Amino acid sequence: MPNHVSRRRQLTVRYTLASALLLAAASAAVLALRRKPKPYVPGQENKDITHELDRAVPAGYPAAVQFTNVAEQAGINFRHFQGKRSTQLPEDMGSGAAWGDYDGDGYPDLFIADIAAPMTASPAELAASPGGNRLYHNNRNGTFTDVTAASGVDYKGLCNGAAWADYDNDGKLDLVVTCYDHIILYHNRGDGTFEDVSHKAGLDGFRGFWTGASWGDYDRDGNVDLYICGYVKYKYDATLAGKTSRQFTEMVPYMLNPSSFPPERNLLFHNNGNGTFTEVGKKAGVDDTTGRSLNAAWCDFDGDGWPDLYVANDISENKLYLNLHNGRFKDISEKAWVNEYRGSMGLAVGDWDRDGDPDIFITHWVAQGYALFSNLRYNRGITADPAN
């Protein structure tokens, strides 16, 4: 996801509820009970974008769980974008990563997507770049070995996201990688190597600024389908390179501002069960042509046994699509109170309050805070059907 620091103002969301108490953490917005939250107002200001980012944990604060960075000791020597960055938006994306036990030894391995070189790099410069995607094999002793070249997943480009899934039901995890202007599907041969089957599968003909990827069997036919997030319709214009454009209340470099460009559509690839896919995003109603999408997650949010879809969008409203069980979806974002308008980046789904239904956690752009949406379906005995 985007990782540069511009001057976006801190933005907050306030949700007021009639019969519940709202507990506001320093960087979280919690959706609770009964009454629809107040709308989000872009442009709410704080002192500046980073003035509170380096706050230390208060002395004596209990730390039940602590993490230590062991990347170097573990052999994860990855460095994102080993090149000189310009003010072009595709160069400003962070590294996507995905865990998956591709060799079936019971230990998860790690794939990291990378921007190998600047957009202006020549083919020779790109080939000579030390950057590029990486696959780290888990050695089962706390360390990893870089097996990128030997495995055949050493593509060099401007890559953003990745996701593992067994798309052909052969018992081995395959890998999809999203890039600027490219979608790659790697088939797992079962011997530690992968084959690029993007053309054979029908994925290589789609050009766009592709970011997040999420696998899910939305039609429950036993074959996992693929959702791809599109960011913006980016086009470099040298005449605008030195200019600025508005982002919320701020003026930022034009070519670095996602608000300068119209949203890219999202793609839904239906798995045909024979190693190929058919793109049905518009037909299914999930192409989200108004969202600058960075992440998506499949989950059965309403408990009907069918996977629904949540999409996290940057500088555009997030979307929640309800599965209608007929290959189509209904946009219930507003009725479900989850269509917030911020710089949504990371997305995770889980039952944080252990009440039996999945909740949504979203990370946002610098100093915009995080959001935790609590699913009301089983909250205090209330069954909330957002479709009604």
Where do the protein language model's features map onto the residues?
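Acidic, glycine/proline-rich Ca2+-coordinating loop motifs
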Residues: M1-N388
